[in-house]
Structures are given as structure tokens and as C-alpha cells.
Amino acid sequence: MAVGLINGRLAADEEARAEVDVLNSRLEKTSQLTKKIQACLARLDATGKSVRDVAGPLSGETRKLQVLGNNIDAVIAAIEKLRSPADSKNDEEQIIRMGPEKAGLPNYLASIKRLNKALNDMKASNLRSTQQTVADLQRLVKTGNSQLESSFDKLLRSETPRAIEPLHYLTKNMPFPVLSQEKITRLGLMNSYLTGVHQQNTGAGSSQESPVIKIYAEVRAQYLLSTLGNLATASTNTAKKKTPEAVYKAGTNGMGTYAQAMEGLFLAEYDNICSIFMREDWGPVFQATCQPALVELGRTLRELNSHIKSHITTDCYLAYEIVEIISSLSSNLENRTGELKSSLAAALKPIRETAKSSLVDLLEETKRQVNSLQTLPADGAPTPLATQTMQRLQSMVNFLRPISSIMISIGDGGWKSAAASKGGATDTIPSLVSFDVGADGQEIFAHYCADTIETLLSSLDARARVLYQQKKAVIGVFLANNVTVIERMINESGLVTLLQSRLQVLDVWRKKATALYTETCKEISIHLFDTVHTNRTARPGSGQGMVSSASIMKGLSSKDKEKIKGMFTAFNSGFEDMVARHKQFTMEKEVRQMLAQDVQHMLEPLYNRFWDRYHEIDKGKGKYVKYDKGSIAAVFRSLY
């Protein structure tokens, strides 16, 4: 049993030794393999180093070759690019020679844009070999631009009539015609391109006008000028009157229609311009297009101004009307377009200055006409000058709006100075900014009317004192008649609302007239102031009532009685003469009543007192005492 165990242990040891031997054998092989690998790695490292030493320079050269290759490719591409315009030049030239009408505007514009791009690219390359191609392209572009301008001109002219009849549109309240939308689109495309070319050639900030603007302004300006020509002529012709003395009536001149047509045409033209041109060009194009028509307007206004100045007393109202018409036209156009205000102001200036100076001229003319009177009505009738002057003021009320603006511009009382007639104003249409905003034009005009009336009456008074040779009664009647005519014409017209608070000027002159007329009454009344001293014993005591005429007569001496008789006789003579002259005078109804009342109030109480005291002087025979209280009252009533 022990031998068996030993044998088993020996066998296991032998087996373990065998495994160890195997492992040692494998370890030795592994060690040998490792040494071989290390030797291979050493050789590989040496080989890699040699490769690196050789491959490094080759890599740098390769990169250089790659860059060179890329550059060559770029040059080839550039050459191809430069060759492309030259190759396509014939195709583009064919389109250009066809023109925008045949080739079609979009196709034509695309072609000319391609030519421009090719030309710019070639100029940028600056290659000597492309100089001929550059010259050819420049020629084509120039031809294309020229044809495009010609096409713009041709299309615009084909759509622009020589003239239209403006009254057709005004009477039917129709808008003035504009260019068709299809034509506007084509014109806009051409303008957009040609304007860009012009800015490129001259610089964006250049003040030089684009050829397209010149073409448009030339074509459309002639259309506007021709359309408005007949209305301009009509405005001057309607100013001519068959009767030189006839006063101008509002609306009878053609200027209103002329301005209305001008406004409609100009606004329609502005719509065209806004649809075709770029915004920054709207103002310049509009100004250039309208300028010839505005020049003609200025010429027309100067001609009318000459006519007005030659007939200032009858046609000054035309100046006022034109001021309002052109001011309204300017305001409407400025509100819509922001343009033409200064041009219209310059055209209006002569008329406006004449309108301002007319205020002074009319006052001076009033004085001149009065001073030129060689005779006045012997019966004291009112002078036609009073009626004419008031008719002038009444007519002015019909033009109150323009007159109010003129009044504000010259200031209250400005018509009293020569400066108003010289007109040193600038070429501007006044606005509220240029005025005293607190000024009331109507109030200033009312002041002017009052000054006119005062000037008229003062001049008539001075002239009457000369021509009537200080005959106060007829002077009084004359002044009173004229005052009444003036007052009546104020109350029966639009002047009443303006002058209601200023009628005191007439009251002053009415009192002057009454005072002059009643001077005769004062002379007559002297004969009714007795200074006879009666006997004290004949005087009634206090509270005894009035002493009878018979009692007074008893107390008079013969000398006093003769004196009383003479006073009655003198009164009768003066009174009858005054009554006769009163009835011979030509008086307005109001004047006759006023003066009759003043005479009665002045003389009747004095006569009644005198009659009460002394009517018994002729015992009722009527030799000296021709009028009793009743009969003289009847005479006074007959004066009314």
C-alpha cells in the first residue's frame, strides 16, 4: 500500500517536471522571438528614418505643385471668363441692333445690362489683349443707351397729344387724362436704367440733368403749353371792355377757368411723373415740365396788370380776384406736390403789387376827382362821385378775402404811406407766417373804408366852400345829401356789417351839414330876440300868468312899436326867403326831414314866444304879423 502511494507520487512529479520542461522550452522560444522582434523593430526604425529623410522634401514640392495647379486653373477660368463676352458679343449686338421695340424691352434691357457687366469686367482686367473688345463693347453700350433714349422719346411722344380741350374736362367735371399704365410701366423701366447710367457717368451728386428728364420735360411741357394757350389768350381778351367806364364784375374774366385748368393739368402731370421717375426726381421734373406754362402765365398776368393799371378805378377788382385765384392755385398745388409756390409767387407779384398800390391810388383818385370838379349842383344835389366811391367800396366787399390778405400784408393804415404803392415785397405769396397773426384783415379793411369816406367828405367840403362861394345853406344841403347817400349805400350792402361800429364818422359830418344849413336860421332868429323894456307897472306879478299882447302893446312907446314892426317885417322877409330856398333845394328824403325838423325846432318856439307878446302890433290886419301860430306851423310842416 505504501509502495503504491510512492509510485503514484513519483508519477505526479514526473508529470509536473514534464510540464515545467515544456513551459521552459516555450519560454526560451518566446525569448528568442522577442529578440528577433526587437531586432526587426530596430531595423524598421532605421528604415523609417531614412524614409522620412527622403519624403520630407518631396511633400513640400508636392504642396507647391498643388498651389501652382490651382493658380493655373484660376487663370484658365479667368481667360474663359474674358473670352465669354467676346464670344457672346455677336449675340448681344444682334439684340441691340434690333432695338427695344423689336427685341422686347425686358430682353433688350437684360442684354444691355449684360454688356455693361462684361465691359466693367474687362476694364477691371486691364489686359492689353482685350482693348479691342472693350472698344466694341463701349460702342454697343453707347448705341444701346442712345436707342433706349430714342425709344423713350418715341413712346412718350406717341402717347402725348399736341393739345387737349380743357373746357371739355372742366365743364363735365372729369379728371384730366394721364398716361396709360402700360406705357407708364415701359417708360419707368427705361428711366430706371438710363438714370442709373447717368448717375454712374456723372456721379451721384451731380447737378447735371438726366437726358430722360430733358426729354420728358420737353415733350410734356409743350403739351401743357399748347393746351393752356387758348385760356391764356381768353384771360387777356375778356379783360377788354366795350365800355371803358364799366366796373369789373367778379367772375367775368377767364383767369378763374385758366387757373382751374392749370391746376388739373399740373396735378395729372404730377401723377405721371410720380409713376415714372424716382422720388428724388419728382420735384425737378415737375418744375421743368411746368416751367414754360408758368412763363406764359407770367406773361399773361403782366399783360393784365398793364390793363388794370390803365383802368385802376374800374378794374382794380380784377387784380383782387387774380390775387385770390393764383393764391388758391399755389396753395392747392403746394399741398399736393410741395412745388411751384415760388414760381407762382413771381408770376403773381406784379398783380399783387398793383392790388396793394390801388388802395393808395383810389384814395388819391378820389381827391383828384373832387378837386377837378368845376361846378357843383346849384340846388345842393349829391354829386355822382359819392355814389361812385361807395359803389367801389361795395364792389370791394365782393373780394373781401384777397383784400383782407392784402390789408394784413400792408398793415393797418399802410395805405396812408407812399410805401404801399412802391411795393418792395419779395417774390412770395404771403402766408399766415409772414403776417401779424393777431391782425384782422376785415377790421383793417373797415378802417380803410372809413378813411375813404372821410377823404371823400373832406374833399367835397373843401371843394364846396370854393365853388359855392361860402353859401353855407347850400353847402350844408350838399354835404347832408352826400352823407345820406353814403349811409344808405352802406346800409343796403355788405358794408353794413363792416362799418356798423364806424358810422360815427357820418354823424360828425351830418352835424357839420346841419350847422351850416341852420346858419340862416340863426340870422333870422335874431329878429325874434326883443330887447324892448316895457313899463314896470305893466308887468304881471308872480303867479299872475302870461301878460296879453294887448297889455304889452299899451306899455310900448311909439319908437318901440316901430321897432317891433320892423322885426316882424325882417323876420317875414328872411323866413319866406329861407322857405323858398328850402323848397328849391334838391334834398334826399331823409335830409329834407332832418333839416326841416332842425329849422322848426330852432325857429318855431322863438316865433311863438314873439307872436304871443307882439301879435297885436297890427290889430290882426296881417300887415306886419303875417303868420299866427297855426299858419307858421303849417309852413314848417310844408318843409318836410
Swiss-Prot record:
GO terms for molecular function: phosphatidylinositol-4,5-bisphosphate binding. It is found in: Bud; Bud neck. Pfam families: Exo70_C, Exo70_N. GO terms for biological process: exocytosis; protein transport. GO terms for cellular component: cellular bud neck; exocyst. The keyword Protein transport applies. Keywords: Exocytosis, Protein transport, Transport. Its main location: other. Belongs to the EXO70 family. Involved in the secretory pathway as part of the exocyst complex which tethers secretory vesicles to the sites of exocytosis. Also plays a role in the assembly of the exocyst. This is Exocyst complex protein exo70.
